[in-house]
Regions:
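Acidic, low-complexity intrinsically disordered segments
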Residues: 2-29, 54-98
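Beta-strand elements of well-folded, non-transmembrane domains
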Residues: 32-51, 77
Length: 98
């Protein structure tokens, strides 16, 4: 079994955040390569947001929650696809604006 490292969660979160942008729904797939493993994320999710005014007066759109409708996380090595311990709850920790 492949153990998903925090560096992988961070890279997936950064890529996903860029793909989500300011949308309230995301449906798509993308791949990342990490060391000797190719990872493929498939996700359909509802994005809950709120606006917050910063001290300097600028308004920012922040993610409150992301609710997956469907998700898959595949890991492929030289030997083919292997099971992994990916946890969507852990990915959310990297995505949610605190």
């Amino acid at each position: 079994m492949y153990t998903v490292l925090s560096k992988v969660y961070l890279e997936v979160a950064e890529r996903l955040s860029a793909l989500i942008g300011t949308s309230q729904y995301y449906s798509g797939a993308f791949e990342i390569d990490f060391e000797d493993v190719s990872c493929r994320m498939v996700l359909s999710a509802v994005i809950y947001r709120h606006n917050e005014t910063l001290p300097e007066g600028r308004v920012v759109d922040l993610i409150d929650n992301i609710i997956p409708v469907w998700w898959e996380f595949h890991t492929i090595t030289e030997e083919g696809e292997v099971l992994n311990d990916f946890d969507f709850a852990e990915l959310k920790e990297y995505l949610l604006d605190k």
